[in-house]
Amino acid sequence: MSEGPVYAQPSPGEATQRALVTVVFLRMLARPNRPATILPPGVSVTPERLDVAAYRALYNGVGGPWLWWLRRLMPDAQLEKHLANATTSISLLRVDGEVAGFFELDAAYWPFVNLNYFGLLPKFVGRGLGRLFLDYAVDEVFKGASSLRGMSVNTCNADHPRALPNYLAAGFEEYRRGRETWDIPTRLGFVIPEKVRG
């Protein structure tokens, strides 16, 4: 059976594809000792409230190559409530005015903030933006309240191969890893990479 929220459980008899993934959990308990991130000309990051359709388009565009599937199954009403929650914040990366990626922060477990999602649209991958954008996200979290105790994120071996090295280089430290079984509905159209195919 697939691990995760109730809405992610396949319906009885539904065709699924199985992925066996290694999930790595990381955290950062203090801001890295480095200068604040400076965005180059033409690059901007802005916090925004997205509606369900805009969020789904961005989530699917960024996460499609990397098996981001859970939010695809989240009911619209539940996703709308999540996006409107005061503990949820989403910031968009733009390059010359064009949306290039996003990150989603979740402060529901304050004094810890989780980086729920982070990534770039495919056409912007490989242009040196990922680390810059990640450093900016870290700065945004740690510039706030003094009661903050840390920031967390997780990744897996279905993600971009640079994801884990980038998190480690940004100052996150691994504290746990585990194996998960994902039964992903075939109707979502994913091609399961050989390395995680169950």
PLM regions with names:
Residues 142-155:
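Conserved GNAT acetyl-CoA-binding A-motif
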